[in-house]
């Protein structure tokens, strides 16, 4: 008289809201010394003057919904670091938009004349995406 008992899975899933994960990433790397360590690890450099970092993170209040995680200039490179917990094949497009906004801000802050006859020197762009989602990511 044995009834088939279905085994129940007692696996619990903890979901953290995306905005909190983004906020954590931003909070951790908002400290210049920690960000410099990450930059050095990614670029195989050994810079130690965190004051060389100039933050250029887009604020969504200014740019109507556009927000990036961490962006900064160091030694002639405009770095954009994005944290993603879900796959998004449109990250290159978003990166292009973010860089456009950042260059616009850089040009204004440095009073550069994009209509002049002199070729402007702008920071070189570097885009890094940190992905820690559960879906497999193809190379």
Predicted regions and their residues:
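Accessory alpha/beta interaction modules
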Residues: 2-139
